Amino acid sequence: MQTRFPPIALVMFLITGLTPFFSTAQPVMPDYTAVTDERLLNPEARNWLSYRGTLDGWGFSRLDEIDDSNVQQLEPVWSFSTGVLGGHEAPPIVNNGVMFVTTPGNLVYAIDAASGDLLWRYQHDLPETYIAFHRTNRGVALYGDKVYTATLDARVVALDATTGRKVWDSTVQDNNFGYYITMAPLAIDGKILVGTSGGELGIRGFIVALDAETGEEVWRTYTVPAPGEPGNATWPGESWRTGGAAVWVPGHYDGELGLAYFGTGNPGPWIGDQRPGDNLYTNSVLALDIKTGEIRAHHQYHWNGSWDWDEVSTPILMPVERQGRLIDALVHPGRNGYLWTLERSADDISFVDAEPYVYQNAFASIDPETGRPTYDPEHKPTTGSTTSFCPSLWGGKDWPPAAYNPETGLLYIPANDNHCGVIEGRDVTYMPGSAYMGARTQMTVPEGADHIGEIQAWDMNTGEEVWTREFDSHNWGGILTTSGNLIFSGGTSDRLFRAHNASTGELLWEFKTNSGIIGVPSTFSVDGKQYVAVQAGWGVDAAGMTARLDMVRGTRTFVPQGGVIWVFALPN
């Protein structure tokens, strides 16, 4: 069986048709603890209950058995082959010794987190043909006694956490029109929140909340406003119907304000002169009332986007001091190459400042009051012309998450510098389920560039970069940081999983896995012993960027394929 991908000059995937599968390898731990709002908002250090460990998106753990003095002794204690090829991006999610992991193609594994023994496996029944540019998945959400996963055919499935059996299955949109889901859901307030991918397929983005018990729709908020809704005037004619603004990275949540924050993607088609206007709410952060879905506030990072710089990564909710005042900030290392600091409140998102953290030549200036950029017309793609710009469409940071450590006070960014792009703008006609970009792309590297990938550490109170580590390869590795004064990440084509000193950036430990790592790391403890976990499995845009760099550099980089969950600990 062949998965139907839309026609596009990108890597095509031949997917074997999947059939439903469920198995129980051994009894699941009988003391599975229900996941409540209280636990999600104040998780125990031993668990990793959500995508970034906490709903503020820090990617930080208070565990410190593994620290900067002993991490050199870290060793693998078990590994588990997923049996799946392609890019493995999901973090291992852990609740009281039970690990939940997803793979490309919508498999969900429940595993004994200490031993690596399989507890159950669920394989989603995908149709014989479905439309998706990427078949990856970014993980599960836990709530109550259920595990929630979102699928490539635009469904959300609730599974019994102890058995893996399906409880409910809800369709959120029609995959035939290019809607598909790769994100991990956000679970809070009795609701399961998801958006969809498909920004290159002429979709109209949205965020939908489903009842966690029944799967029934509670509310739906579109990220491109229709006539009569605020912001529709920023779209000419009927262009809002296919305007994009996809939501494909999990949101974060402020429990005191009752607001869920989500980032949105690029407009469609890619070239801005085909849809003049600001094109709200593309390339923005939205604050949604968790009860109603009402958009309470927004900030648009760049208007009338023409570079494919999705700003889907949700800002980190963290404290930042500015001019002697502590603010509740939203901090966002943008794909557009700027590091954004915003202030959040119950009914507003206000601009604080923005500075480039990689080389960027498309913005001529940024308004110091509003944060609205002014563009250099030489570097803004237009229809019928070929335009160069920096960074390339993959941006200063794509979706892999940054992290914040409150003990070092530093923000850690998986960045890419020294790469630029070329877009040839073309007219395009919308056809349901087909590519709707109107662009031909290339990648370039400035002469003399000695590296691409970086890990940057920033003190957001001073707005200064404290240290940087450079890699010859691009860096596609989400970051985990801990109370052990450590950061963990993969992301480079050399297959290495690394630990750095969180204060200085010194490399302390590395381990070569079976494949490149684009999975997001997590950490947890069982019976008082700390573990660090990550999925290896190269693919998706990281592999695409590797191929583009090889073309530019005249190199041939081989990265083995295949998904493996790796779990590390100190020797007993």
Language-model segments: residues:
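Blade/loop signatures of beta-propeller domains
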Residues: Q26-P76, T223-P230, P373-H379, T444-V445, ...
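Repeat-blade elements of multi-bladed beta-propeller folds
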Residues: W48-R52, G87-L107, I131-V156, Y180-R204, ...
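N-terminal cofactor/phosphate-binding cores enriched in small/glycine residues
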Residues: G57-Q173, T481-T482
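Extracytoplasmic beta-rich repeat domains
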Residues: F80-I93, R121-A141, K166-A184, L201, ...
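Beta-propeller blade signature
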Residues: L159, G205-E216, D278-G293, E343, ...
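Repeat-solenoid scaffold signature
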Residues: Y180-T214, W303-A364, E378-C390, W394-W399, ...
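Short, conserved, GDST-rich strand-edge loop motifs in beta-rich repeat architectures
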Residues: V194-G205, F262-N279, D417-G448, G537-T557
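Blade-level signature of beta-propeller repeat domains, shared across WD40, Kelch, NHL, RCC1
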Residues: S522-N572
